[in-house]
Amino acid sequence: MSKFFVNVAPINNSNSSSSHTTTSSNTQRHQQHQQHYGGSGTTGHTMVARRLNYDLHGGTTSINNNNNIVIKNESVDLDYDHVLSSSDSNSNGGVAAHLRDHVYISLDKGHNTGAVATAAAAATAGHTQQQLQQQHHHQNQQQRKATGKSNDITNYYKVKRRPHAVSDEIHPKKQAKQSAHHQTVYQKHTASSAPQQLRHSHHQLRHDADAELDEDVVERVAKPASHHPFSLSTPQQQLAASVASSSSSGDRNRADTSLGILTKKFVDLLQESPDGVVDLNEASNRLHVQKRRIYDITNVLEGINILEKKSKNNIQWRCGQSMVSQERSRHIEADSLRLEQQENELNKAIDLMRENLAEISQEVENSGGMAYVTQNDLLNVDLFKDQIVIVIKAPPEAKLVLPNTKLPREIYVKAENSGEINVFLCHDTSPENSPIAPGAGYVGAPGAGCVRTATSTRLHPLTNQRLNDPLFNNIDAMSTKGLFQTPYRSARNLSKSIEEAAKQSQPEYNNICDIAMGQHHNLNQQQQQQQQQLLQQPEEDDVDVELNQLVPTLTNPVVRTHQFQQHQQPSIQELFSSLTESSPPTPTKRRREAAAAAIAAGSSTTATTTLNSHNNRNHSNHSNHSNHSSSNNSKSQPPTIGYGSSQRRSDVPMYNCAMEGATTTSATADTTAATSRSAAASSLQMQFAAVAESNNGSSSGGGGGGGGYGSIAGAGANADPHQPYSHDRNSLPPGVADCDANSNSSSVTLQGLDALFNDIGSDYFSNDIAFVSINPPDDNDYPYALNANEGIDRLFDFGSDAYGP
């Protein structure tokens, strides 16, 4: 509510009305003062209200010049507008108890001049005041009679009384604002023509005005005395002005009373407390702030679980006697020290890296911009020892991604602009680490100084020195994997391959048998000529030929012959590479019975070989061949051929492969001259070859001409005419041959059975079951895809156990 009052009665603009109102107002004020201070108690209580009147500086109210406006501070005596008359002793009668501390100023709507009017500072003469007082009293009585009790409460303005003096402190901003917009002019009330009886009342009026000046906040503007257009006449005014100026200059700043500073001070009080408990009343007194400010701090600290309320006005830290425990403080200090040390180490490392980078840059500049490393530089690094080093040359913007850091087996290099990426293998070419070393050939071979390869190392693991290279360390494990159980997929693939080869080879094999039965006489002469040509050639041990013999294919049987020791022996053996004996034993028994019958009947012999590859059972029989020779003519008796003991292996059935582990022997017997007829079937566009020799001779103690086996090596070709033979008497025993794929150029026994057949009908092979189909496993049992390369290691069995000493 405003501290100033404006005119509540409508002001008449006419000069006469204004002049009359001013005169009556001055008279009324003087009369009221005289009644109040002069001991007249018949009138009601009055209140001095301060109002600002804007009068023109010229003193004339008729001039409408607003440029010269002087603010006048006047004291106006106001009467309570009560229903009771002025003669009533109880002026508060009829006012409610809760409204007694207020002053109500009535608004007279029907009269031109109200109870409150503009007041002037000049005092009039005594007789004039007497008349005006009587006139004003008469007007008040008429007003009360007219209005009566009809005045509504809304017609009053409420003014709050001030039971206590206002504090001397004024905010600097408010004080500056008031000093800028208001200029209070103090005007002394002097009575030049007043009589002696009014001097005391005017002195009391000035004293009351000075008291009101001390109580009112708005009137105390911090200005020096020199700025006022008037001088302060009383000591009270000078004291008030000095207090106002000192309070304004020494006022505290807002930052001093902020919550942040108060919170710090409050925390200091908590730390000073021995048990961490602080009384809020004591804190408010020590900090010189209101208690609600302390509550603002404690509410926030309670919200973040730092404080807890112990009682009504006592709060305590939640962490106990100290805000931070000693152990936690030690941990914090240790962590801070450790982090500082790490920071120092990192700073040193960064400085070192910068120095190294500067040195490298300087070296590059000194070398003319050429920065490169050689292969030896990379291989000499200890980190890359015994490792495969790969050098990648990529554009600068290329990205290298390592998918799995735990198993760094793969890396991805990608160029953003599709630049060229070059990858180089940095390998060690020193002699001790080279995978190809000179001077390591076959033992005892002429080419001992040839290059040693991985194949020769695998075929000769016992006679050759092992390579010192990490790439060939597991060569034995690779070569012996055929010794383990064949997986389902390999077994199925092997069965499929055998079946397909059997279907392709069966018609041609039957055709060979028919030709051998019908044209065996013509073949005898051709085989004799081939045998003579082979005997004339020297024996050689060629490594390439040996490797070709040791690495056959599915349809390429290899037979290697050796020297036949006994000369002039009329033994004829016909060699055939045969299929695996996977058929039931019934056809085998039939062939054996037919061979025995043919030998007993003395028919011409026919050489054949029984399919016995990869079956490790040996059958050995001894048959005696009797050769009788005379001086005039020589006849050959049909030799007797028995089945020898052979080792059979039933793990992998095969057909049309090399023969192993069979021996045939021949002995001489003193019999009469007989004619020996031999027939051999040679391969026509197949992998079979035969050598036959027919000689007539007789010996009693072992002597005569020489004969031997011919070497059969080649796919779909006849007997090799270049295979060497020798006639040394101290050579190996007769009938020794090898065709195993695992052979290491040493003499092993010939696998298979050599049989001599005489007068066997052409319907023998048609009645006998030469081939038995191999049914592959069902696809439901082995749902795997076929692979033509699987089973090869198992088929040829490159195992280390097959090598002989």
Curated annotation (Swiss-Prot):
A motif (PIP-box K+4 motif) lies at residues 147-161. Residues 144-154, 181-195, 637-647 have a biased composition (Polar residues). The gene is E2f1. One of its GO terms (cellular component) is nucleoplasm. Keywords: Activator, Developmental protein, DNA-binding, Nucleus, Phosphoprotein, Transcription, Transcription regulation, Ubl conjugation. Ubiquitinated by the DCX(DTL) complex, also named CRL4(CDT2) complex, leading to its degradation during S phase. Ubiquitination by the DCX(DTL) complex is essential for cell cycle control and is PCNA-dependent: interacts with PCNA via its PIP-box, while the presence of the containing the 'K+4' motif in the PIP box, recruit the DCX(DTL) complex, leading to its degradation. PANTHER family: TRANSCRIPTION FACTOR E2F, TRANSCRIPTION FACTOR E2F2-RELATED. It is found in: Nucleus. Heterodimer of E2f and Dp. Cooperates to give sequence-specific DNA binding and optimal trans-activation. Interacts with PCNA. This is Transcription factor E2f1. GO terms for biological process: cellular response to gamma radiation; DNA endoreduplication; eggshell chorion gene amplification; G1/S transition of mitotic cell cycle; larval lymph gland hemopoiesis; negative regulation of transcription by RNA polymerase II; positive regulation of apoptotic process; positive regulation of DNA endoreduplication. Transcriptional activator that binds to E2f sites. Required for wild-type growth in mitotic and polytene tissues, Contributes to the expression of replication genes at the G1-S transition and Cyclin E. Activates cell proliferation in wing imaginal disk, which requires expression of vg. GO terms for molecular function: DNA binding; DNA-binding transcription activator activity, RNA polymerase II-specific; DNA-binding transcription factor activity; DNA-binding transcription factor binding; DNA-binding transcription repressor activity, RNA polymerase II-specific; protein dimerization activity; RNA polymerase II cis-regulatory region sequence-specific DNA binding; RNA polymerase II transcription regulatory region sequence-specific DNA binding.
